[in-house]
Amino acid sequence: MSQHLFTAFILTALAGLSTGIGSLIAFVTKHTNKTFLSVSLGFSAGVMIYVSMIEIFPTAQTILTKAMDKKSGSWLTVLAFFGGILLIAIIDKLIPSEENPHEIKTIEEEDQKPTKLMRMGLMTAIAIGIHNFPEGLATFISGLQDASIAIPIVIAIAIHNIPEGIAVSVPIYQATGSKKKAFTYSFLSGLAEPLGAIIGWFLLMPIMNNIVYGAIFSAVAGIMVFISLDELLPAAEEYGKHHLAIYGVISGMLIMAVSLLLFI
């Protein structure tokens, strides 16, 4: 179990700290590659939707129906799934729209007063940190269940964290002229994912059993579906043409399907 815990934590940390990659990209380029971002974000959505509905949700249902009976376990699976959606939706609603990490800006759009830019960067970092808490727990729980499921999820979350890193670092860099400060705040916002995993695990450990574990696993599926539909797909559409986003989604589903088949 300790080996699984270590692996799950490392995977979660890698996903969260990819915000630092976004920060570095912001320093070396003056233009946002919208086509690449559109396809990449669509790809992330495809991976997360496919693995949630084809692998995580059925696995949660199997765990719960074995721990309970078929009817009760199936009902709890569905309730936990939509409970996960409700949780991330509430968190999303509590974040002001102007600071919401879903409202991603391109590098070219940041041109305001230094004080306002600094505040924007700091508030975005805080918002992303709050938003990344449940993502961290979702990645961690997936890693505990099966690393082969978690690795594609980590890649998908890492891809969608890159533009969030840009959203934090660009305004802070333009306000202060300090790459170190911009990178630090971007990096710290990503730490919320492994922190969310640690806090969530220690809170749940005293009550952990197959029913709780299965319910959390189903809620993880709900969280990832909501993130995909509410965040990744709209961002993919905003950055590029409609079909680029859809091609990205289909590619993500295909890669995820093949990777799961390889581990059968």
Swiss-Prot record:
Record's bilayer topology term: Multi-pass membrane protein
Single GO cellular component term: plasma membrane
Binding residues for Zn(2+): E135, H160, E164
InterPro entries the UniProt entry points to: ZIP, Zn_transptr_ZupT
Binding of Fe(2+), residues: N132, E135, N161, E164, E193
Keyword DNA damage: no
Disulfide bridge positions per record: none
Keyword vocabulary terms for this entry: Cell membrane, Ion transport, Iron, Membrane, Metal-binding, Transmembrane, Transmembrane helix, Transport, Zinc, Zinc transport
Localisation: Cell membrane
Domain of life: Bacteria
A GO molecular-function descriptor: metal ion binding
Protein role: Mediates zinc uptake. May also transport other divalent cations.
Protein family membership: Belongs to the ZIP transporter (TC 2.A.5) family. ZupT subfamily.
Name listed for the protein in its UniProt record: Zinc transporter ZupT
Taxonomy of the source species: Bacteria, Bacillati, Bacillota, Bacilli, Lactobacillales
Name of encoding gene: zupT
